[in-house]
Regions:
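Hinge/beta->alpha junction and helix N-cap segments in small-molecule ligand-binding domains
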Residues: 68-78, 97-105, 159-169, 185-231, ...
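Short acidic capping loops at alpha-helix termini that bridge into adjacent secondary structure
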Residues: 180-181, 212-216, 266-271
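Flexible loop/turn connectors
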Residues: 233-334
Length: 334
């Protein structure tokens, strides 16, 4: 038997779609006689209301918009999987919008599309342009959750990792072994997460009463593998370090390959670690040691947090900090 829809109920009951939705939502504005008629048809058709049917009366579209830079896709695709699965479980539609690149996308145009499609809420990814994005969603009073950075704002939720703790613990471990020549590699120097990673590194050096020179120990690189690889082929002709820590797996792979092509043995001559733990870390030779972030879970948590905000559910906090795991493979000595 064909599954009944809200259109079938409205037609059989002789009422509008909005009236059916109001009955489903228990609205008091519907006359008792009309309510009884609609409920009778719902029972006869065995109609099971979904979020869209409920949303017609509440002016909700049950749609969540995701906005992220195209160049981050390799790092966030698993996160999008978590967002999609959580959205389906909670009967929300997910619409994806991409900006051209980190910090360079037409954010005003994207936000105009989000507003035009009447998305109930927005999930943003931490990027160089995040401050502008947050201001835009606040300006238009769109509920939002940011993934990848802590946001202390009553109107914005966030799902993040403690980036300072990650680098502090890693760097502190190497400094305790007497391995002081450590550099940090990232394509996003202005990113709040990157700033936090650098701060954690600085603190470890300070606690060991060792000098930290940001001008030489923090290296800005490209988001494109080929450019990063070329940059480090040149760098390793004159430099070798105890540890290179990269903010993303892709940059970590570029470092490993450039080092090997300069006859630097990984991990005997130099160790390499990166963050995220995507498939890049497994196809690298030697395999790349990483900080595993629960990417899929972060996406699912962001959806759950956003839906609670949308439904005005009571929340202990809008700032959700998730854990991480150190995964040691062949690019480090452990």
């Amino acid at each position: 038997m064909k599954k009944a829809t809200i259109y079938d109920v409205a037609r059989e009951a002789g009422v509008s779609l909005a009236t059916v939705s109001r009955v489903i939502n228990g609205s008091s504005v519907v006359r008792e006689k009309t309510k009884e008629k609609v409920m009778k048809v719902i029972d006869e058709l065995n109609f099971k209301p979904n979020q869209i049917a409920r949303g017609l009366a509440t002016n909700k579209t049950t749609t969540i918009a995701i906005i992220f830079p195209q160049s981050l896709f390799a790092h966030v695709k698993d996160m999008i999987g978590g967002i999609g699965d959580a959205g389906r479980t909670l009967d929300y539609n997910i619409t994806i919008y991409t900006t051209d690149d980190i910090g360079n996308g037409p954010m005003d145009d994207v936000m105009e599309k989000v507003i035009r499609t009447r998305a109930d809420g927005v999930i943003l990814f931490n990027n160089d342009n995040i401050d502008q994005q947050i201001e835009l969603v606040k300006k238009h009073s769109i509920p939002a959750v940011v993934i990848g950075m802590q946001v202390s704002d009553e109107s914005i939720g966030s799902v993040y990792v403690d980036a300072q703790k990650i680098t502090y613990d890693i760097v502190n471990n190497y400094l305790e072994k007497g391995k002081n020549d450590i550099i940090f590699v990232s394509p996003q120097q202005n990113l709040i997460r990157t700033v936090d990673l650098i701060e954690g590194m600085k603190k470890a050096y300070q606690d060991h009463q060792l000098p930290f020179d940001e001008s030489t120990q923090v290296i800005n690189t490209s988001t494109h593998y080929e450019e990063s690889y070329t940059q480090f082929v040149e760098h390793f002709r004159n430099h070798k370090h105890d540890l290179v820590f990269a903010s993303y797996d892709k940059e970590g792979v570029a470092v490993v390959n450039a080092a090997v092509d300069n006859n630097i043995s990984i991990p005997d001559d130099m160790e390499v670690m990166a963050m995220m733990d995507t498939s890049y870390s497994l196809i690298c030779r030697p395999s790349l040691s990483t900080i595993h972030l629960p990417i899929y879970d972060m996406g699912a948590l962001a959806v759950r947090l956003l839906t609670k905000i949308l439904n005005q559910e009571e929340l202990e906090t809008k700032e959700v900090c998730v854990g991480y795991t150190n995964i040691y493979r062949k690019s480090t000595i452990q």
